[in-house]
From Swiss-Prot:
InterPro entries: P-loop_NTPase (IPR027417), Rab24 (IPR041828), Small_GTP-bd (IPR005225), Small_GTPase (IPR001806)
Residues where lipid is bound covalently (S-geranylgeranyl cysteine): C200, C201
Keywords from the named record: Autophagy, Cytoplasm, Cytoplasmic vesicle, Cytoskeleton, GTP-binding, Hydrolase, Lipoprotein, Magnesium, Membrane, Metal-binding, Nucleotide-binding, Phosphoprotein, Prenylation, Protein transport, Transport
Membrane-related topology note: Lipid-anchor
Residues binding GTP: G19, K20, T21, T40, G66, K121, D123, K156
Cofactor(s) of this protein: Mg(2+)
Name the record gives this protein: Ras-related protein Rab-24
Miscellaneous note of the record: The unusual Ser-67, instead of a conserved Gln in other family members, is the cause of low GTPase activity. As a result, the predominant nucleotide associated with the protein is GTP.
Start and end residues of each stretch annotated as Switch I: 30-45
GO MF annotation list: G protein activity; GTP binding; GTPase activity
UniProt modified residues of type Phosphotyrosine: Y17, Y172
Protein species of origin: Homo sapiens
Region described as Switch II: 63-80
EC number(s) reported in the record: 3.6.5.2
Length: 203
């Protein structure tokens, strides 16, 4: 794979108002939009080119609608996704329950999709810790259980946003290289652990 271009389909999932679009805006355009909230209808697509070692990686990011009325439509966009960033609002416990729904959906329909749990709006906790409604340790236990990775982010300050997307790209490149290596050796991938599946936390 040395020097090759790599394309990765990434889907953003989560309840409306959790800040999926803000997360993408911060990562792709390095900006935080302040103004009236606008619902994403269907999905918005944006691409970001980056480097991982000697490889050029293009993240094709699908920002899906969070409203339940667009739920069926969202399924169209995560078909074939290699990574899913499932977002929840750290100040809204119901958004974490909704995130669990999307994880179940992905596990049943896209088994090969690596999941990243993303707690949003961490800047609000810096202002007032009492606003936290989703316990960090509970989410970490859940992440460990589903073999996902956990990040707590802020689109306003940029906290852990670049790190999240960089990890998505690095993990995919590692898995792709692993698959090429094992295929070259004639190894049955079904007997090998997927190196995607480990958990870590970033504050």
């Amino acid at each position: 794979m040395s020097g090759q271009r790599v394309d990765v389909k990434v889907v953003m999932l989560g309840k409306e108002y959790v800040g999926k679009t803000s997360l993408v805006e911060r990562y792709v355009h390095d900006r935080f939009l302040v103004g009236p909230y606008q619902n994403t209808i269907g999905a918005a697509f944006v691409a970001k080119v980056m480097s991982v070692g000697d490889r050029t990686v293009t993240l094709g990011i699908w920002d899906t609608a969070g409203s339940e009325r667009y739920e069926a439509m969202s399924r169209i966009y995560y078909r074939g996704a290699k990574a899913a960033i499932v977002c929840y609002d750290l100040t809204d416990s119901s958004s974490f329950e909704r995130a669990k729904f999307w994880v179940k959906e992905l596990r049943s329909l896209e088994e090969g999709c690596q999941i990243y749990l993303c707690g949003t709006k961490s800047d609000l906790l810096e202002e007032d810790r009492r606003r936290r409604r989703v316990d960090f340790h509970d989410v970490q236990d859940y992440a460990d259980n589903i073999k996902a990775q956990l990040f707590e982010t802020s689109s306003k300050t940029g906290q852990s946003v670049d790190e999240l997307f960089q990890k998505v790209a690095e993990d995919y490149v590692s898995v792709a290289a692993f698959q090429v290596m094992t295929e070259d050796k004639g190894v049955d991938l079904g007997q090998k652990p997927n190196p995607y599946f480990y958990s870590c936390c970033h504050h």
